[in-house]
Each structure stands twice: as C-alpha cells, then as structure tokens.
C-alpha cells in the first residue's frame, strides 16, 4: 500500500501543480507502476474544474464560468500538456528532418505554429464546453480522464524518439498490467459518469485509442517515435476528440 501511495503521489506531482510536498521514490519502476493512476489524476483535475464550474455558474454567466474553468485546468497542470502541443506544432510544421524536429521541440522559445495551436486548442475547448456543459456538465471530468488514459495507451504501444527525456519515463516502460489497471479505472469512472451507458463508454474509449494509434504512427514518421512533448500533445488531441464525441452523443 505504501508503494502504491508513493507511485500515485509521484504521478500526481508530475502531471499537476497540486502541492504534494512528499519525499517520493522516483525510480523507473515507480513511474511505470504510477502510470496506472493517470486516469485518476484526470478525475482529480476534472473534478476540481467541475466544482469550480458549479460555484462560478451561481455568480457568473456561462461564458465567464467556462473561461475560469479552462484557466483552472491550465493552472492545475502548469500548462504541461498545452506546452507539448505547442512544441509539437513548432517541430512538425518546420518540415525539417527528424533530428532537427526534436531539437526544435526542445527549444524553450515559442514559435508561430505553437501560438496558433494553443489558441485553437483553447478556443475549441471553450466552444465545446459552452455547447455541452449546460446540459451535461460532467464532460468537464470525462474529457481529462479519457485523455490521461490515452497517454498510458500511446506510451504502451509507442517507442522513444530519443535516448533520454521525460517521455522515456513511460514510453517502453509501461507494461500490460499498468495498461489494464489504467483501462479499468477509466471504464469504471466513465461508466458511472455516463449514466451507466456502456455503449457510450465503449465509443469514447475506442475513439480515443484509435486517435492515439494514428497519432503514434504519425509521430513515428515525423520524429522517429515519442517524446514527453508528444505525449502531452496526444493528451490535448484526445481531450478535444472526446469533447467532439460527447457533443455528438449528447446533442443527437
């Protein structure tokens, strides 16, 4: 139990800015086991955002409340995944060779494509939240749960693009059991949040995993594999896709 708590808090500390303030073991196996808890981190992040929405909507309009919810998500994660999306777009749309693409993604300076990607990402989230949240506010929790599970999946099927880096803590380090427990947490969580509609749960999970599979193929061609930035980019892409799927399901 002590090891499980260590691994959970390690992943929570890595993926969020929530102050854990614990001396944690940070060995490679801790990150491997901790990957199982990524969907649970999504529950925590999304849950906090959902509570913020419920409080804000009492005082503010829908538009203002959604802006605050999105801002809260960025603050909670330290813009970790959004930054990965921006770095990916700067690298991939430079149309350079693989080595140069990885070098561009490591550059701390932000480029035009990164700016555009981040703006579009936030606008899409804002638009889908405004469309769906009034009738189904639990999308605020469902989207980050599904997107964190997709990180586990793509890290399981992918290969590292470089010999060192934060992405290597998970890529080719996650085993079948970690994928199984992450899937179990995701399915159970979505099952209850989706009013026990198993068909909708399967649709969301299949869509997210299929997108991650395609994104992995794309990353192999462009960068030769996955990096930490590309894991973050996959998170954002699947989060938006989940919103698209929920928009279709809820409004049909």
Swiss-Prot record:
Gene Ontology annotations of biological process type: cobalamin biosynthetic process
Involved pathway(s): Cofactor biosynthesis; adenosylcobalamin biosynthesis; adenosylcobalamin from cob(II)yrinate a,c-diamide: step 7/7
Enzyme Commission numbers on file: 2.7.8.26
Keyword Protein biosynthesis: no
Reaction catalysis annotation: alpha-ribazole + adenosylcob(III)inamide-GDP = adenosylcob(III)alamin + GMP + H(+); alpha-ribazole 5'-phosphate + adenosylcob(III)inamide-GDP = adenosylcob(III)alamin 5'-phosphate + GMP + H(+)
Keywords linked to the UniProt accession: Cell membrane, Cobalamin biosynthesis, Magnesium, Membrane, Transferase, Transmembrane, Transmembrane helix
Listed transmembrane segments: 34-54, 55-75, 113-133, 138-158, 174-194, 198-218, 230-250
Subcellular location: Cell membrane
Superkingdom of origin: Bacteria
GO cellular component, as recorded: plasma membrane
NCBIfam families: cobS
Family membership: Belongs to the CobS family.
Function, as annotated: Joins adenosylcobinamide-GDP and alpha-ribazole to generate adenosylcobalamin (Ado-cobalamin). Also synthesizes adenosylcobalamin 5'-phosphate from adenosylcobinamide-GDP and alpha-ribazole 5'-phosphate.
Protein name: Adenosylcobinamide-GDP ribazoletransferase
Organism classification: Bacteria, Bacillati, Bacillota, Clostridia, Eubacteriales
């Amino acid at each position: 139990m002590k090891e499980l708590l260590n691994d959970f808090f390690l992943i929570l500390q890595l993926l969020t800015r929530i102050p854990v303030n614990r001396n944690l073991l940070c060995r490679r196996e801790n990150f491997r086991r901790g990957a199982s808890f990524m969907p649970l981190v999504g529950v925590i992040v999304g849950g906090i955002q959902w509570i913020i929405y419920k409080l804000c909507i009492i005082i503010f309009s829908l538009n203002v409340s959604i802006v605050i919810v999105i801002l809260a998500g960025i603050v909670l994660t330290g813009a970790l995944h959004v930054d990965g999306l921006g770095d990916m777009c700067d690298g991939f749309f430079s149309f350079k060779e693989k080595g140069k693409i990885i070098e561009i993604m490591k550059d701390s300076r932000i480029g035009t494509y990164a700016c555009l990607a981040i703006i579009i990402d936030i606008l899409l989230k804002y638009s889908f939240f405004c469309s769906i949240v009034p009738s189904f506010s639990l999308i605020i929790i469902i989207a980050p749960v599904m997107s964190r599970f997709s990180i586990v999946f793509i890290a399981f099927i992918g290969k590292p693009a470089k010999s060192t880096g934060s992405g290597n803590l998970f890529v080719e380090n996650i085993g079948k059991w970690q994928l199984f427990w992450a899937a179990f947490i995701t399915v159970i969580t979505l099952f209850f949040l989706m009013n026990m509609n198993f068909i909708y749960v399967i649709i969301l999970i299949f869509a997210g995993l299929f997108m991650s599979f395609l994104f992995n193929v794309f990353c192999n061609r462009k960068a030769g594999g996955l990096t930490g930035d590309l894991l973050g980019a996959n998170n954002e892409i699947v989060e938006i896709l989940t919103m698209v799927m929920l928009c279709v399901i809820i409004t049909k």
